[in-house]
């Protein structure tokens, strides 16, 4: 897709860790395990005056708090942003509210596998050391096979060597596109990992006996979908 690009040493999360550090160094506060559930507007409905935040406590219970604000910058999905606006003072037209409510998102699951090796390698060239053939050169591989659910493979070693503690091992991510609440989303971690490993083995990319560790992550609303009410 592209020949060269910049990438954080410890992955994209490092970017936001740096942003968070700078915000806190400047006196800002970051609320973890919290989400905005309501926007309170001024009487004329032209600005946001405060937000209602729901925070999760250590005992698992939730508490709400109203926080005044001078500026409000949103990274919420549009669907949730419009739904959170105080309906009593809302100036959001009904057709806009209906469009926002009908927006569709694709959810995402990634299964990480730590491997002793991949079965696929770079093409051998005369005089090339075996160690140089251990990994394919790609950062990601898009999967075209119609008989598997897998959408894309990431090889984290090739993103940054600092993402893998042991450079002799291979750390890959298997990416699946799904919908929150569907059968694939509702699999247990163990079921999902077994499913992903079986698919990759069926493609000849790995042997399941080479799996050293595994992890599954769910990501809600990873991608906006350009259909349903989006066209309106």
Placement of each model-derived feature along the sequence:
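Active-site/ligand-binding neighborhood in enzyme catalytic cores
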Residues: 1-41, 68
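Glycine-rich, flexible loop/turn motifs
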Residues: 2-3, 99, 137, 149, ...
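Short, local alpha-helical segments
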Residues: 2-4, 176-182, 218-222
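Mid-domain catalytic core of redox enzymes
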Residues: 8, 34-204
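Proline-rich low-complexity regions
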Residues: 8, 210-211, 222-225
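A generic structural signal for alpha->beta connector loops
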Residues: 27, 75, 150, 208-211
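A short coil-to-beta-strand element that immediately follows conserved catalytic motifs
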Residues: 31, 108, 206-218
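FAD-binding beta-loop-beta segment adjacent to the flavin cofactor pocket
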Residues: 160-167, 219-232
């Amino acid at each position: 897709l592209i020949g060269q690009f910049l990438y954080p040493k410890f992955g994209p999360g490092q970017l936001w860790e740096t942003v968070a550090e700078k915000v806190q160094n400047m006196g800002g506060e970051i609320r973890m395990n919290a989400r905005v559930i309501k926007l309170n507007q001024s009487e004329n409905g032209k600005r946001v005056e405060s937000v209602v935040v729901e925070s999760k406590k250590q005992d698992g219970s939730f508490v709400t708090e109203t926080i005044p604000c001078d500026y409000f910058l949103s990274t919420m999905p549009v669907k949730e942003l419009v739904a959170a606006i105080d309906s009593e003072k809302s100036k959001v037209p009904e057709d806009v509210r209906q469009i926002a409510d009908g927006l569709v998102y694709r959810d995402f699951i990634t299964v990480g596998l730590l491997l002793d090796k991949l079965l696929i390698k770079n093409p051998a060239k005369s005089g090339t050391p075996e160690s140089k053939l251990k990994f394919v050169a790609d950062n990601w591989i898009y999967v075209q096979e119609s008989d598997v659910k897998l959408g894309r493979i990431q090889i984290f070693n090739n993103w940054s060597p600092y993402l893998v503690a042991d450079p002799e091992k291979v750390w890959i991510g298997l990416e699946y596109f799904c919908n929150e609440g569907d059968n694939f989303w509702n699999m247990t971690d163990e079921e999902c990992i077994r499913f992903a490993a079986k698919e990759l083995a069926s493609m000849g990319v790995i042997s399941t006996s080479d799996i050293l560790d595994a992890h599954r992550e769910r990501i809600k609303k990873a991608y906006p979908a350009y259909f349903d009410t989006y066209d309106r």
